[in-house]
Amino acid sequence: MDIDHCMPVFDMAYSDDNHLPYYIQRSTHHVVRDVDYTGFICYPLQVDLNDNVEVGADIYHMKIKTMRFNVDIYNNDVATKFPGWVRFIVFCTPPVSSWVNDGCSSLFSPFVGVNSFIDPKLLKRDGHGITVLHDGIYCLCHQEHFTRSFEFNFRGPGNYTLTSDVCWSPATNVDSIYVACVASWCGDSAFMLQSDSVSWVHKRFWQRPVLEFGQCLDDLPDHDNDCG
């Protein structure tokens, strides 16, 4: 079976002589939250990709194959009613640039010099670098909407094993995916995100969400680095 061609077939089990069964799962989610100058980082998924399953000496992870975002950001800065800017970023850990969108990505902290409130949240979660999937700054007039759709494709096989003495393999693993947003204005401005993702899910992850969709990074434990 060619797993790259069974993407449209959701909720199916697959196994062979080398891998435990996993499922191909499709998930759709929706979140609305406020966005202003303080910014936020949140998960666009209902699962934490760091929640490992250990089977003997092997570690299995959930794998994202394709993720689509529909974003709508609304400038409702009633205090000034001036135009303002918003920065929307999608990134993942660890650095996997050659395996995301055919290598079209860059490695840097997206928040340096932009929003100091966010930087500690990112540094708390990952000390080995990130892969920026999208980083855009957009100007919005008062009561104007920013709407955009994005699609990210992650290459590599499914839930292949990681032995205890091997760290993250960029060919097969995305540790976690994050969405961040920060704006120049104050007030009740809205951030809306819809995500549609297709994943390989190990059978022990099946219907076992550990995070609420859109949960903020501040609320999460620091358990990113499984390899010390």
UniProtKB/Swiss-Prot annotation:
Localisation per UniProt entry: Host nucleus; Host cytoplasm
Annotated GO CC locations: host cell cytoplasm; host cell nucleus
A Pfam cross-reference name: Benyvirus_P25
InterPro entries per the UniProt record, alphabetical: BNYVV_p25/p26
Keywords associated with the record: Host cytoplasm, Host nucleus
Signal peptide: none
Functional summary from the UniProt entry: Probably influences symptom severity in a synergistic fashion with P25.
Stated family: Belongs to the benyvirus P25 protein family.
Protein name (record): Protein P26
Gene: P26
